[in-house]
């Protein structure tokens, strides 16, 4: 399978995904946004605490 065939198949796959996908309604979008931001905040806080602990322990 050549490069042109791969690109053609990839384009067809993307078309199929786009045709099946649907836009989320406003409430689902905001729920996803809130969950994403909470997880991002949690991971950032965890990384900060780990860095703080290592800087205190190692001087």
Curated annotation (Swiss-Prot):
GO molecular function: protein transmembrane transporter activity
Gene Ontology cellular-component terms listed: plasma membrane
UniProt keyword terms in alphabetical order: Cell membrane, Membrane, Protein transport, Translocation, Transmembrane, Transmembrane helix, Transport
Transmembrane segments: 37-57
Membrane topology: Single-pass membrane protein
SUPFAM superfamilies per UniProt: Preprotein translocase SecE subunit
InterPro entries: Prot_translocase_SecE_dom_sf, Translocase_SecE/Sec61-g
Principal location class: membrane
GO BP field: intracellular protein transmembrane transport; protein secretion; protein targeting
Location of the protein in the cell: Cell membrane
Keyword Nucleotide-binding: no
Disulfide bonding pattern of the chain: none
Domain of life: Archaea
Similarity comment: family membership: Belongs to the SecE/SEC61-gamma family.
Reported function: Essential subunit of the Sec protein translocation channel SecYEG. Clamps together the 2 halves of SecY. May contact the channel plug during translocation.
Subunit structure as annotated in this protein's UniProt entry: Component of the Sec protein translocase complex. Heterotrimer consisting of SecY (alpha), SecG (beta) and SecE (gamma) subunits. The heterotrimers can form oligomers, although 1 heterotrimer is thought to be able to translocate proteins. Interacts with the ribosome. May interact with SecDF, and other proteins may be involved.
Name this polypeptide is given: Protein translocase subunit SecE
């Amino acid at each position: 399978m050549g490069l042109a065939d791969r690109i053609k198949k990839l384009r067809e796959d993307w078309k199929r995904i786009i045709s099946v996908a649907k836009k989320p309604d406003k409430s689902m979008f905001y729920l996803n946004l809130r969950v994403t931001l909470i997880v991002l905040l949690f991971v950032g806080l965890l990384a900060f605490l780990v860095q703080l602990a290592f800087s205190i322990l190692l001087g």
